[in-house]
Amino acid sequence: MNNNFTKYLSTAPVIGVLWMTFTAGFIIELNRFFPDVLYFYL
């Protein structure tokens, strides 16, 4: 069972969802502490 679970975690949709969740959280926290950084270069 452990082999199937690690194979499931290494699939592209799971890695994509985890990566997008991390990226969204990072941008949200960056925007919370530095609200003008995202719009500075526009």
Curated annotation (Swiss-Prot):
Bilayer-crossing regions: 8-28
* Lineage top rank: taxon: Eukaryota
Q: For this UniProt entry, what's an example GO CC term?
A: chloroplast thylakoid membrane
InterPro entries attached to this UniProt entry: PSI_PsaJ (IPR002615), PSI_PsaJ_sf (IPR036062)
Compartments, as annotated in UniProt: Plastid, Chloroplast thylakoid membrane
Keyword Zinc in annotation = no
The reply to whether Membrane figures as a keyword in the UniProt entry is: yes
A Gene Ontology annotation in the biological process aspect, one of them, is:
photosynthesis
Q: What UniProt keywords are attached to this protein's entry? A: Chloroplast, Membrane, Photosynthesis, Photosystem I, Plastid, Thylakoid, Transmembrane, Transmembrane helix
Which topology term describes how it sits in the membrane?
A: Single-pass membrane protein
According to its UniProt record, which protein family does this protein belong to?
Belongs to the PsaJ family.
Purpose: May help in the organization of the PsaE and PsaF subunits.
Q: Can you say what this protein is called?
A: Photosystem I reaction center subunit IX
Q: What is the lineage of its organism?
A: Eukaryota, Rhodophyta, Bangiophyceae, Bangiales, Bangiaceae
| Gene name as annotated | psaJ
